[in-house]
């Protein structure tokens, strides 16, 4: 696919698989803007990055067989493999559009870790867990997540997604404080 916004150049092609997508050439601009992780001579994009960059018209996703994929097809593809993917995507898109750099946060007990600036120069500031309004959370769950985030010098943020179709997100932040 050609893109008028980049001088008519072809968009980087992204081969989609269960874990995200792989871009094998013309990905330098994406990498410079902190999208993906470079492995050898390919850029690995996680599922959220894959959908976001497709929605923004910055990559051209395709199946392993070379068939093009739309944003809706990508959302359905990843949702089948990861329940709650759409709610996570709504939060990913919101944070990215607010200027944050958003990466996986599973290592820290959340869906995302969020950087306010250059992730090569600073540590992430927040660990974000995504929930829907009917999600039951015990006080123990919240305290455990807050304490874990504190132990790695981050604030714990709960992102409550009210509606994935007409996105409404409520962010609640906790900090661990010794008295």
UniProtKB/Swiss-Prot annotation:
Q: In the record, what terms sit under GO molecular function?
A: lyase activity; nucleic acid binding; tRNA-intron endonuclease activity
Query: Active-site residues?
Result: 115, 123, 154
EC class = lyase
Q: Which UniProt keywords apply?
A: Lyase, tRNA processing
Family matches, as Pfam families: tRNA_int_endo (PF01974), tRNA_int_endo_N (PF02778)
Name the chemical reaction catalysed here: pretRNA = a 3'-half-tRNA molecule with a 5'-OH end + a 5'-half-tRNA molecule with a 2',3'-cyclic phosphate end + an intron with a 2',3'-cyclic phosphate and a 5'-hydroxyl terminus
Read off the InterPro entries from this record: tRNA_endonuc-like_dom_sf, tRNA_intron_Endo_cat-like_sf, tRNA_intron_Endonuc_cat-like, tRNA_intron_Endonuc_N, tRNA_intron_Endonuc_N_sf, tRNA_splic, tRNA_splic_arch_short
Q: What is its EC number?
A: 4.6.1.16
Could you tell me which cysteines form disulfide bridges?
A: none
Q: Which domain of life is it from?
A: Archaea
Q: Name one GO biological process term.
A: tRNA-type intron splice site recognition and cleavage
**Cited function:** Endonuclease that removes tRNA introns. Cleaves pre-tRNA at the 5'- and 3'-splice sites to release the intron. The products are an intron and two tRNA half-molecules bearing 2',3' cyclic phosphate and 5'-OH termini. Recognizes a pseudosymmetric substrate in which 2 bulged loops of 3 bases are separated by a stem of 4 bp.
Family in the record: Belongs to the tRNA-intron endonuclease family. Archaeal short subfamily.
Q: How does it assemble?
A: Homotetramer; although the tetramer contains four active sites, only two participate in the cleavage. Therefore, it should be considered as a dimer of dimers.
Q: What is this protein called?
A: tRNA-splicing endonuclease
The major lineage groups are: Archaea, Methanobacteriati, Methanobacteriota, Methanomada group, Methanopyri
């Amino acid at each position: 696919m050609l893109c008028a916004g980049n001088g008519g150049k072809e968009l980087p092609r992204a081969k989609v698989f269960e874990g995200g997508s792989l871009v094998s050439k013309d990905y330098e601009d994406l990498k410079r803007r902190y999208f993906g992780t470079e492995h050898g001579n390919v850029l690995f994009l996680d599922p959220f990055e894959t959908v976001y960059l497709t929605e923004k018209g910055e990559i051209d996703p395709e199946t392993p067989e070379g068939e093009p994929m739309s944003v809706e097809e990508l959302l359905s593809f990843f949702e089948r493999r990861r329940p709650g993917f759409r709610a996570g995507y709504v939060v990913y898109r919101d944070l990215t559009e607010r200027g944050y750099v958003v990466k996986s946060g599973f290592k820290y007990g959340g869906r995302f870790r969020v950087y306010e600036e250059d992730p090569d120069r600073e540590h992430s500031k927040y660990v974000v867990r995504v929930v829907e309004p009917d999600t039951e959370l015990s006080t123990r769950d919240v305290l455990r997540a807050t304490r874990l985030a504190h132990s790695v010098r981050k604030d714990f943020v709960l992102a409550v997604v009210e509606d994935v179709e007409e996105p409404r997100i409520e962010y609640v932040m906790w900090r661990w404080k010794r008295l």
